[in-house]
Each structure stands twice: as structure tokens, then as C-alpha cells.
Amino acid sequence: MPKLELHNLNKTYTPKIIPVKNITLSVDDREFLTLLGPSGCGKSTALRLIAGLETPTHGRISIGGKDVTHQPPGDRNIAMVFQSYALYPHMTVYENLCSGLKLKRLPLPEINQRVAEVAQVLGLEDLMHRKPAQLSGGQRQRIAVGRALVRRPDVFLLDEPLSNLDALLRERVRADLKQLFATQSVPVVYVTHDQTEAMTLSTKVAVLNNGYVQQLDQPEQIYNRPANLFVAGFVGSPQMNLLTLDCERQHAILGDISIPIPASFPVPTQLIMGIRPEHIQIAKPEDLAAIRGRVSLVENLGMHYLVSVEIHNSRLGTMIIRVLIPSDRNWNTEEISLMLPPQHIHWFDIDTGNSLRSRTS
């Protein structure tokens, strides 16, 4: 039985403001689910509904098989880590860690045991007598996580806990979180707009947009088999190339070449083709199957160049394809020939935006 389950969850503020729409998903023990999406997609509202900080308009929330939809937060045995850490500035690290346990009136020996165990796991033993103002951002974040751990909850909820950290510290704390939650036996629900956090931390990802779950899957499936145009464009950096192409006789026309479309796909007059910049290959100029274009922009990313290539299409005008090229690769910086491996091409319905692959696989 799933430890956390959302069934047809909705939240309506006004007829025009509906941040959560028909969300149904489950998170088992030891699973790490990330709610990923842009600002305003409904991910934080969904987390607040799970926490009991807001009440759903309709739908059901269950934890451990028990319906908690209308239970107050204190009766759900959840622990939440906030973006702002939510530490008491006048308390020491020790006092912050044990404050929730004292409110639950646990015996002092048990409180001290739990706090000592968590302090050892998080490396906080030498900080126990300091106050938050005397700590770095990374240390404060570890204490916020520690406050959640000492509760021994049925579900962990984390609301963008790394967004206040600088890039280097965020990378280090992200690795710490991955190791830490791999040892926990309860579900984790994590909210972020950062796809790197979602891809590296999660066992599964729910991509949200406009209140709906666009795709719920393992991170590698989200990346390699996007269900629709939104997921394809939102997940991946640099962004996937998405080109609207004319079609005829089971081929799409791009520049001087025609690209075969799988025979099992229905083919209207136009389709949207997608391919990620890292999957495009440089071809020899004499290769007849290659697409030829002119380099319009080169961006140095360190290990790679991100190269924008103009492709002339006699029917639809000039199109831009972006390709990642290793920085140690020699290539013509003016004219370039490209190959699009068919196994890395995605096809999307121009009207619905849905992946054609998802219809047939």
C-alpha cells in the first residue's frame, strides 16, 4: 500500500484561480518524488495541501492508508523543511532541534537521544551551542533538515530548500541530501523549479504546469521520453530544439533533406520535431544526408560550445538549430553540416502537443 496517496486533488480559490487540478499520484516508502515546474504551476500549493496548511476543494489525501484530508497539520505526523529554514533566531542549534519534541512532551532522555543521533548524521556536534546568526547558509539548512529528522515523521516535505544557497554550496548540500534521504524509509516529497535538483535527487518526478501533472515518471524517462511539448521544452538545458516542419509521404522536410517519420505514426500536413542539442552530430560536408547551415552564434560554456545554426527552409523560412560541440573538437565556424540521429528525434502532434511516441509505445 502506498504510504502517501493523492486522489483527484483540486484546489480552487476563484473560478479563474485553480492552482491544483485533478492531481492523482502515490509515493511509497523510500521513494523520493519531486514536484517540478515553473513559478505558478501549483507545486507549492500541492505541498501545502499535503501538509494540511490548506484544505483541498475536493479530492483525498491519505498517509499510511489513513484519510487525512481534513486533519490538522499536527495530526498528520509530517515534517516540513522550508525555503527560509524557519529557525528560531534566539535559540541555539540544540534548542532548535529539540523544540518540536518538547512541544510533543516527549521524555527528556528520548529527546536528547534523538537530537544526538541526528547531530551525528548531519555533522552538527560542534555547533550545538551556536545560534543561527553565527552559522553559514549551509549549516542553517542542515539544522532545518535536522529538525525534520528528529520528528521521525511518516512523510518528509521539502519546499525549495536550496534556493537561498549560492551555486557552489547548493551543489554540495544537494549531494548531502541525496545521501541522507537514501537512508530514510519514508516517502519524501520535494518541490523545486530547478531541474538539476529534480533529476539528481529523485526516484520519480512529476512535472507540473497550470495545475496539471504533465508527466509522472522516472527522471531518465522524463528526459528521454517527454510526454508532450511542455515537458520537452522545460526539462533539459540547453533546451530541446523544437521545429515545426511540413510533412509529405511519411517524411518531414528540413532544409535540403527529408527526415523519415516512423511508419506507425499518423502524419498530418505538419508535425513538430524535437531533438536535444547534445544529440546532434557534426557531419562531413560531402555527406548527402547531412543538413547544411550557417553558424550565427557561438556561446562558450567551458566544456562545450553552444552553437546556433541557421537552416534555410524554402517553405517555412529560416530556422535555428542549436547544437552542443565539445570545446576540443575542430569544426568550421562559418558553415557546418549536421546529422540528426533518428533514435534521438521526438515527434509531437502540432494540435495537441502530445508526443506521438507515447501513442504507440
Regions found by a protein language model. Name each.
Residues G59-D67:
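Conserved ABC transporter NBD signature motif
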